[in-house]
Amino acid sequence: KNLPECNVEMVTNGDPLNPKRLNKLFESGLDKILISAYDGKEDADKLEDLCVSANLTKEQYIVRHRYYSEEQDFGITLSNRSGLMENAEFKIESLKEPLKKPCYIPSYTFFLDYQGDVLMCPHDWGKKVILGDFKKEKLLDIWFSKKSSSIRKMLNKSNRNMEPCNVCDVEGTFMGKKNAGYFN
């Protein structure tokens, strides 16, 4: 209601979904759901059928195939997840020096985890930067807080000298340049 031009999306592995829950999410204001299928085509087909049974339109959902081979990068663009992939099975080393490029991700979106923590970036799996608590604070207060604004300004000026950005290999300029202009 308060942000009619805001697009609300959710990313999930689909485990907790059923038709009733899907419909409730969309009734509550969700615009699109992106569901990652990791276990093969059968899994993807089941998720597709689930969305159809909930009467979702093709514009309301995307089932993302994440089960491809290692040679196909598993169907995803791999990153070091802000330095957390060094100890993973598929090691991607942390950067020794921060990228000297802007990152616009916090200028056009934020991420809400299942506990209500508002994160600046989907790559901050270690939750190094928590912008606020959605259970206790209003979205706009978190979005326009000193902390959020300061981080956006730093990253928009190619300054990644803060955790976890200093070890992150994500380009961060794929989208959001126009939005970044509002925060400089």
Regions found by a protein language model. Give the residues of each.
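Core AdoMet radical
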Residues: 5-17, 30-67
